[in-house]
């Protein structure tokens, strides 16, 4: 019986793992920012989606490693087995405390409050008002309330970063368009001229390295 439960748990975890990585880690922010930068440069398929996602995954693994290591050490020290479901549930909940803290830290508090209240309302119905907690009093929100709040928060943050990264490239496009218009070269596509200029500037500034460092530094205190 224990082996059957272990197999079912392993299969369930393997099925959910890609979705957890894609929406429950900083991968969601990294991948969005990288794609937006590529579009801002005027490049369609270079670097390819596979390359960008691979780099985003590697950076995400680097950022999330302290949390994964702490969870691994906890499960190893506690000698968690799959024989007792109640015990397993307790150990999983305690072992994910580090991940829960990470989600709380990088999630919008209003979104956390919204999903937590929605979960309470679904659980208690009309009695929600009597058990509703203020957002400052939420000490240990549910993982199922934190995950959507975190994903939406990271998407919002990624689009903010992408907006600021887009601005200098838009300026280059406008300048090139104005110059071509002043020279009477209205038939020439501004993209033909602006794309090489943006590439030269981006490479000269070592843009990918600066961008990756800036994204990683946002999470450098999660191990503290």
Curated annotation (Swiss-Prot):
The gene is spaP. It is a multi-pass membrane protein. It holds the Pfam family FliP. It comes from Salmonella typhimurium (strain LT2 / SGSC1412 / ATCC 700720). NCBIfam families: PRK12796.1, PRK12797.1, yscR. Its main location: membrane. The chain crosses the membrane at residues 8-28, 55-75, 161-181, 185-205. Belongs to the FliP/MopC/SpaP family. Keywords: Cell membrane, Membrane, Transmembrane, Transmembrane helix, Virulence. GO terms for cellular component: plasma membrane. This is Surface presentation of antigens protein SpaP. Involved in a secretory pathway responsible for the surface presentation of determinants needed for the entry of Salmonella species into mammalian cells. It is found in: Cell membrane. One of its GO terms (biological process) is bacterial-type flagellum-dependent swarming motility.
């Amino acid at each position: 019986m224990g082996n059957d439960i272990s197999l079912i748990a392993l299969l369930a975890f393997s099925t959910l793992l890609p979705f957890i990585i894609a929406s429950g880690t900083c991968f969601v922010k990294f991948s969005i920012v990288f794609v937006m930068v590529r579009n801002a440069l005027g490049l369609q398929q270079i670097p390819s989606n596979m390359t960008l996602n691979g780099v985003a995954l590697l950076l995400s693994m680097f950022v999330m490693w302290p949390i994964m290591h702490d969870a691994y050490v906890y499960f190893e020290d506690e000698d968690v087995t799959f024989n007792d479901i109640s015990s397993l549930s307790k150990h999983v909940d305690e072992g994910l405390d580090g991940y829960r803290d990470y989600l709380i830290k990088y999630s919008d508090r209003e979104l956390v409050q919204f999903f937590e209240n929605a979960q309470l309302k679904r659980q208690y119905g009309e009695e929600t008002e009597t058990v509703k907690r203020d957002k400052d009093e939420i000490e240990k929100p549910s993982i199922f309330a934190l995950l959507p709040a975190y994903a939406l928060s990271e998407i919002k943050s990624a689009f903010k970063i992408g907006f600021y990264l887009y601005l200098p490239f838009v300026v280059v496009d406008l300048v090139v368009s104005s110059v071509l218009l002043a020279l009477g070269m209205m038939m020439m596509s501004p993209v033909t001229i602006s794309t090489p200029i943006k590439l030269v500037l981006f490479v000269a500034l070592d843009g990918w390295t600066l961008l990756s460092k800036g994204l990683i530094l946002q999470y450098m205190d999660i191990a503290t």
